[in-house]
Amino acid sequence: MAKAPMRVAVTGAAGQIGYSLLFRIANGDMLGKDQPVILQLLDLPQAQAAVKGVVMELEDCAFPLLAGVVITDDPKVAFKDADVALLVGARPRSKGMERKDLLEANAQIFTVQGKALDEVASRDVKVLVVGNPANTNAYIAMKSAPNLKRENFTAMLRLDHNRALSQIAAKTGKPVSSIEKMFVWGNHSPTMYADYRYATVDGKSVKDMINDPVWNNDVFLPTVGKRGAAIIEARGLSSAASAANAAIDHVHDWVLGSNGKVVTMGIPSNGEYGIPNDVMFGYPVTTANGKYEIVKGLEIDAYSQEKINITLKELEEERAGVQHLLG
């Protein structure tokens, strides 16, 4: 028996990340090879022609799972009955723009989108915010949607997670698929803390294999934290395909389960590990049956606590910077 199509809303559909994302969703990479999808694409009025061009290409791929496409500049049309919403579109930082101005510009976008989701999306919609600053944008959307469950709103830390996995694989000479229990705490920003103290390869401790605190502090964490900037420097454009891939991974595992593997998601805190309530924070989680669960009982040593405090401080400052816009 064929499954009913799932409705997937994507904002910023004409952008670089959107272009890397849509074909993979339509191919079944995100929701499964037996799950038809209807894509509901949102972008600004001036981007509608570009979105139509992308849709022409989607049609030309003749994806068996693509059951329909909606193109719109109205959030209420894009989010109507959405089962999954990928909030990719955000205001990028322009030259000379203060961080405060960036936060405020995005707060306006994500307040509108949060309210629209609240009004028209499926009550079980799974929302992933990709557009930066992702954690705070997710917090704003969540706060603007009081009738949806808090846990429906998440921020993308999976790119940091995947970047960290790749660096550890390179350092240990082991395949990336063999690394388990590596995760990231905090904000999707250079302050994130990638933590491999519990990580294993084939049951052996990664920390013991590497055994190099200087590498951890001076090479590993800065490389992962500043990878986005390094890609812009090299490519002249921001990381789009790897961000799209991380979004696919995040939603795939959330919907279909991570099979016991620990992954990283930015989720609203309930006070776990001393993080204040409602802060949208990167946590180690496992996922099953469409739900995520924070990994409990991890010991936080003094070094890790210091790193967690730094990223938390940044998130609290961002939150304070938009609080007056949330009414």
From Swiss-Prot:
Its EC number is 1.1.1.37. CDD domains: MDH_chloroplast-like. One of its GO terms (biological process) is malate metabolic process. Substrate binds at R93, R99, N132, R163. Catalyzes the reversible oxidation of malate to oxaloacetate. Belongs to the LDH/MDH superfamily. MDH type 2 family. NAD(+) binds at G12, A13, A14, G15, Q16, I17, G18, N106, Q113, V130, G131, N132. It is an enzyme of class 1 (oxidoreductase). Keywords: NAD, Oxidoreductase, Tricarboxylic acid cycle. Transmembrane segments: none annotated. This is Malate dehydrogenase. GO terms for molecular function: L-malate dehydrogenase (NAD+) activity. The gene is mdh. It catalyses: (S)-malate + NAD(+) = oxaloacetate + NADH + H(+). PANTHER family: MALATE DEHYDROGENASE (PTHR23382). Pfam families: Ldh_1_C (PF02866), Ldh_1_N (PF00056). It comes from the Bacteria. The lineage of its organism: Bacteria, Pseudomonadati, Pseudomonadota, Betaproteobacteria, Burkholderiales. InterPro entries: L-lactate/malate_DH, Lactate/malate_DH_C, Lactate/malate_DH_N, Lactate_DH/Glyco_Ohase_4_C, Malate_DH_type2, NAD(P)-bd_dom_sf. The active site is at H188.
